Amino acid sequence: MNGHEWLSPVLRLRSEMQPLRTDVEASVRSLPEIRAVIFDVYGTLVISGSGDVGSADTRDHSDLIEQSLEAVGIDDLLPKRPTMEMIHSQIESINARRRADDCPKPEVDIVEVWRRVLRQSGLELGAERVGIAVALAAQYEARANPTWPMPGSFEVLTALANAETPMG
């Protein structure tokens, strides 16, 4: 897998969403001394179709796993079917190992999660085949957590870029 092929399912499987209204009133004021803008992604630049980040998703996504395996073309290569329990177990295991005082909630390396789940399911992926795990992660995430740009995010990013404001 070269380039950004993993992005294709993320774009192809999405559909327009609108953000949920809140009771918070906007408070806009001039900040002339801004030297850079740092964004939180979910809920700021991107709408998430699965709800709040970190919310406990207890839905059974077996059908989404099967669709993703089929889309990547490895559904017939696995002696054992991956399960949500396997995915959650790997996420918990990786997070427990990476958790520290200075990082109480480590970011999940979803490609590593899928590599481990596939290994548990009987498919070992060496470094030369990591693209399979990348493709599978993209296929599954596009189905389980669809996203859509937050209204106005393109305009905000464009205005900041045109003003040469550093962003992160």
Give residue ranges: language-model regions:
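Helix-loop "lid/cap" segments that line or gate small-molecule binding pockets
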Residues: D63-L77, V108-L125
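Low-complexity intrinsically disordered segments
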Residues: P104-P106
